[in-house]
């Protein structure tokens, strides 16, 4: 005869199992295009994080995947923007770094950092890319933001040619961080 604990087995799993740790496992499959295309194969990655309660637009984020990059829909493109290339908008003083360039949809995905105080105003605030001002890469590529484009393209929502990240920066609690050697992705690749 097995005598269950008060409330039955599974009533209080933490107490019954004596658990203090949780193990998780996930797989990154190709570009995840069946979901949203948020997992790019255009760039390598070195860090995997688990974030508790991230926000999206000030509310709880509930999507399966979220893109943390900003994006610009370009027109009149000359040249090709390269991954990790510095981009600038001289008329505004904005500076960024290319994460991915989707030449099919004319979308430039980028991030802005404060590591070297480039692209910040006198108060230390980042200067945003804005308007129909030409964006130039250090390799010579150029494009003009398509400010008349306010639509969803490739699962990215644009307003006047610009898209904000789907996750609010500095939101949520970092529960786990794993630093890895650089992993270069491919469309037919799965990481565990």
Regions found by a protein language model. Name each.
Residues 1-192:
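Interface-prone segments of viral and bacterial extracellular assemblies
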């Amino acid at each position: 005869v097995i005598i269950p604990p008060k409330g039955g087995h599974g009533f209080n799993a933490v107490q019954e199992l004596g658990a203090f740790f949780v193990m998780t496992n996930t797989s990154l499959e190709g570009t995840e295009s069946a979901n949203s295309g948020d997992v790019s194969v255009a760039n390598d990655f070195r860090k995997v994080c688990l974030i508790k309660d991230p926000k999206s637009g000030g509310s709880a984020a509930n999507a399966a995947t979220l893109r943390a990059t900003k994006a610009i829909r370009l027109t009149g493109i000359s040249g090709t923007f390269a991954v990790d290339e510095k981009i600038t908008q001289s008329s505004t003083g904005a500076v960024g770094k290319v994460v991915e360039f989707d030449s099919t949809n004319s979308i430039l995905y980028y991030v802005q950092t404060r590591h070297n105080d480039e692209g910040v105003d006198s108060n230390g605030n980042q200067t945003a890319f804005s308007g129909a001002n030409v964006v130039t890469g250090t390799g010579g590529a150029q494009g003009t933001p398509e400010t008349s484009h306010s639509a969803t393209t490739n699962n990215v929502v644009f307003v006047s040619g610009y898209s904000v990240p789907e996750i609010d920066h500095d939101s949520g609690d970092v529960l786990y961080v794993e630093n890895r050697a650089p992993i270069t992705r491919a469309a037919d690749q799965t990481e565990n």
